[in-house]
Amino acid sequence: MNFNYFILVLFFITSGHAKSETREVHQEAENHIKRGSNTGFNFKTLDKEKRSAEEQNLAEHLVTRGSNKGFNFMVDMINALSNGKRSAEEQDLAEDLVTRGSNKGFNFMVDMIQALSKGKRSAEDQDLAEDLVTRGSNKGFNFMVDMIQALSNGKRSAEEQDLAEHLVTRGSNKGFNFMVDMINALSNGKRSAEEQDLVEDLVTRRSNKGFNFMVDMIQALSKGKRSAEEQDLAEDLVTRGSNKGFNFMVDMIQALSKGKRSAEQEKDMK
């Protein structure tokens, strides 16, 4: 009898603690959205979707497993952000991604990793990074989950490779059209109607200033290689160490915007 009573009490204590912890995590996520510290990722306009249990499991799985060879740099970025620094092995991967010529279309992600590998994160940034890894309310990045799901076999199919090369070579990806292309080619009917509405909304509206850097990066990389000026920018982002948190994205926008933005895009940035 006493043993059963002990088990019952332990169950209620554990259950109550789990619910309290869940409430705290969600409250912290809401605080991130309200306080405006995530303006670079525009969480306020991307909070329409909730992750399914399957997607959440994938997100947690991506942090721990090492078999996702095609997108290991994403996993490494999460790991590097959660610890505040990069290990020697992670640094080797970053250098490998830079030197080998097969990742031309995604070199901007390599630059992001490199820029973060030497920069320091503030305590607030560190809390956000850890929160993004663990919490289940990371609503605005389901498209990344879809992309990872499609590419999680460790290599690209011929069709996926063609898409990547197409995104690099053609210069017609304005706004968020490149995201739509990726989603259309990779999702295979896995997106809900609400998610599709969000994607279309991101393409048509001009209020997503925090993601315009992606457009600029694709435009700058549209020839399959970097110019000397662009290479200098990448090296500068790596060496100067002043990019705390995600400020390097802002710096990249400013550096790439000179002479590369249309009048309409310049107006959007103001």
Curated annotation (Swiss-Prot):
It comes from the Eukaryota. Transmembrane segments: none annotated. It is found in: Secreted. GO terms for biological process: defense response to bacterium. The keyword Signal applies. One of its GO terms (cellular component) is extracellular region. Residues 1-18 form the signal peptide. Keywords: Amidation, Antibiotic, Antimicrobial, Cleavage on pair of basic residues, Secreted, Signal. The keyword Manganese does not apply. Expressed by the skin dorsal glands. Residues 19-35, 52-65, 87-100, 122-135, 157-170, 192-205, 227-240, 262-270 form a propeptide. The modification Lysine amide is found at K118, K223, K258. The modification Asparagine amide is found at N83, N153, N188. Belongs to the maximin-S family. Maximin-S1 has no antimicrobial activity. Has no hemolytic activity. This is Maximins-S type D.
